[in-house]
Amino acid sequence: MKEISEREHDLILALVGEGRTQLPEGVLEKDLVVTAALRRLKEFHDPAKLFFCGGTCLSKAHRVVRRMSEDLDFKIQLSPSLTPSKMRRDLSLLKNNLADHLREGGFDLPQEGVKSRNNNKKICMRLVYRSRFPAVVSLRSELQVQLVEAAPRLSIMELPIDSLVGEMSGTPENRAIWSCLGLEETFIEKIVAFLRRSLRGTRGRIEERPFDLVRHLYDVVMIQRHHNIGQNRNLTVLFREVVQADAREFANQDAEFARDPMKALRKAWWHLEEDPGKVLEVGYQQFARDMVYGEVPAFAEARGIFGAVAKQLLDSAPANG
């Protein structure tokens, strides 16, 4: 089973002991495992192209957020000329080969830890590792790798990735260079993801892990703070495309969203403004305490920034998306 080395273990103890970080040891440890998985995945060769995306990409590649991110997200780009049956077979082969590649790299990936749906267009792998530090409540006990068949809509960037331990200690590392989704596309996808997932709260359903939801809020706010992307009016077209794609993808899981996505997202926007029971605020504070090692806007400020950007996008969209 994958675990960090003795040297890495001692580096973590030194960083925490010297007061160079307030992050729990378990967070730094998992980031090392995440980084090792990224390096291993970079060595995987397949006709399909993998693009690094999501919150971990924002943190480790774009460096626009200063937080621990424990999931690895990728877009898979296949040839557009493939027939549906050939695409399904190619994705199945990629899934199996990638799982074997990770196992050969020392990662514990049981057969039941590999799941796929929608004709293999969505693949999820749960890698198990052995922790040498106390558990952190905000962290899962495994590393989740998620891959979705979808070509990037905008331009990509080639960026290096590092571990938090390497960055904080100044220890030179073997950097992997990844093709990464751009900030604009990630920005829009996270706005839509936050609002869509917030619909659970409007129905009185509490998020099992609210900090999984508020990470989208935090990421959008940090991108907006440092890049002011929300002022780019060209993103309204992208916003509609992402909403429509999500409405198709989640049609069987959320009939209300699929029926009238813009109306549903406006309802979720109001839910953020009201935050009944302060569920989001409490989740945000826990997330900031356990996972963030950089600046942390107060929840009220973060909600205001996110709300303004989301409202501008929603107001630009037709009444029925």
Give residue ranges: language-model regions.
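Glycine-rich beta-strand-to-loop/alpha-helix junction loops that act as flexible
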Residues: F52-T56
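Structured mid-to-C-terminal alpha-helical surface segments
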Residues: M1-L50, K60-R66, I76-G321
